[in-house]
Amino acid sequence: MNPLKSPLEGFLNILKPPGMTSHDVVAKARRILREKRIGHMGTLDPDAAGVLPIALGQATRLIELVRGDKSYRAQLLLGRITDSQDVSGRIVEEHPIPQLTRQAWEELLKEFQGLMEQIPPMVSAVSVGGKRLYEYARQGIEVERPSRKINIDRIDIVQYHEHAPGELILDVDCSGGTYIRTLCHDIGQRLGCGAIMGWLIRRRSGPFRLQNSCTLKELEQGLAPEKLVSPGEVLQHLPNMEINERRLPALKQGLAQFLPDKNWMEGQWIRMNYRGQLLAVGQAIWQDDRWLCQPRKVLQWSESILK
């Protein structure tokens, strides 16, 4: 049962092809589905492929609450530095490639796991001084960029050949906001020979996985109902509270709801469900010596949920 007013509200896991921007994918989805309210979760470079989840209708209001962790498979190419940190850029330096054993590589990659600081590349969409970095890059201007905290959970070597030491295939699990091209660049700087990213595939974005994605061509042939994921499924990582039927009118008005005794954290996001259906998301607040859930995003739902 879909509690929302429109059947075309939820999340779609799109398989972005190389050669399209994330904006292109959203624009095409708008035309196919005839839905204006569409937003994507996490830009993919035009040359990259893989998982690009999009939100439809009211689900666009929930994008910020979707898990942001990502998984990638990437090609690392040694011996070059480019102005874009990937294979599409202009080569600015070339260096001899060192000979490393697989064991030496595994030890080196351990240095790039865990919490660290990363400086976004000039070709990214990060805003500095009111402009996107890629806008500066197009003008040939390099500006100082503030570093960002990221987390690399895992780096595994998928493919390595001693007779071709200039190329590795890596699997990376990381936090949202991590730039794989910059990770490749930093590895090259650590080795002193430079490195760039070749191809890139995003295999997972939050709960969305490559094997469950659909292509734009499939979407053109008709939206399969099982491909539309409900907001409640996507936000399963958030704690849940059940709303009593008599409190539904108060919820619609955005009034705070009493939370059962628990060690809540101020500002913690909570799913607000009725009969297992997501109707709103709120935040825990401490007020009048008790915990309340203050609705922040109340969805418009069909009255059929009361039947």
Swiss-Prot record:
Q: Which organism is it from?
A: Heliobacterium mobile
Q: What does this protein do?
A: Responsible for synthesis of pseudouridine from uracil-55 in the psi GC loop of transfer RNAs.
**Annotated catalytic residues:** D45
Q: Which InterPro entries match?
A: PsdUridine_synth_cat_dom_sf, PsdUridine_synth_N, tRNA_psdUridine_synth_TruB, TruB_C
Give start-end of the signal peptide.
none
Q: Name one GO biological process term.
A: tRNA modification
**NCBIfam families for the chain:** TruB
Q: Name one Pfam family in it.
A: TruB_N
What's the domain of life for this entry? Bacteria
Query: Which Gene3D superfamilies does the record match to this protein?
Result: Pseudouridine synthase
Show the catalytic activity: uridine(55) in tRNA = pseudouridine(55) in tRNA
PANTHER family xrefs: PSEUDOURIDYLATE SYNTHASE TRUB1, TRNA-PSEUDOURIDINE SYNTHASE
Primary gene name: truB
Q: Work out whether the entry's keyword set contains tRNA processing.
A: yes
Name of protein:
tRNA pseudouridine synthase B
- What's its EC? 5.4.99.25
Q: One GO MF term, please?
A: RNA binding
Regarding protein family, the annotation reads: Belongs to the pseudouridine synthase TruB family. Type 1 subfamily.
Give UniProt keywords alphabetically: Isomerase, tRNA processing
